[in-house]
Amino acid sequence: MNDLFSFPKNEVIKTNEKLGFKKSKTIEKANLRQSIRDCNFEATMNDLGGFPKSNQYFAIKTNGTSDCGSIFTYALNNWEEITEMYLATWTISKQNISRLKLAVESGKLKNLTMVFSSTLKGANPALYASLVGALKNFKNVKLKEINSHAKTFSISNGIDFLTVSGSANWSENPRIENFLLLNDKDLFEHHKDWMSELTDLV
């Protein structure tokens, strides 16, 4: 098991602070925080030689200095495109909603299937509205709101078939989380099948 991040505690970016800034300052700080988290993950992947090769995996844990969105961004930056993505999460941050939307708009993310918890609407109506409003009108995006607590996503560029599973949602978690990064086509197809089946339900 590799320690993904081993920074001193005073360098950990806390993501649950109550900010007293105007909205523009809040967004600016959130973007900076996310950029730092992305750099943390990129540095670790560089040390490991990039994503796992075919039929290999990395078992890693974090101390709260990165998240699923950082893994997704690393793929965007290192692959020519993501041809397919199958994503299941219980919740998601506004920054990561924006990442997905921008990736679809730019053409870097060709097809997205997303399964998310039916509790989101009641628990956080504003976040629910942001998620659905950002993605529902794209023809190459399928959304399914259902009773789910799954936390996994699978992406492919047509050559590699990466699945990321673990304890973390697509939110910014300032705590220890565990991840498995597996490059396995059969596992990719497994997640593709069950998420596609759910999104095809009325």
Regions found by a protein language model. Name each.
Residues 1-82, 105-106, 120, 161, ...:
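N-terminal localization/anchoring segments of enzymes in phospholipid and broader phosphate metabolism
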Residues 59-65, 89-92, 141-142:
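Short, flexible loop segments at the rims of nucleotide/cofactor-binding pockets, characterized by
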Residues 62-63, 115-117, 143-146:
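Conserved beta-strand termini and adjacent loop/short-helix elements that scaffold enzyme active sites
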Residues 107-112, 135-138, 175-177, 185-188, ...:
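Short, surface-exposed linear patches
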Residues 190-202:
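Cysteine/selenocysteine-centered motifs that mediate thiol-based redox chemistry or coordinate metal-sulfur cofactors
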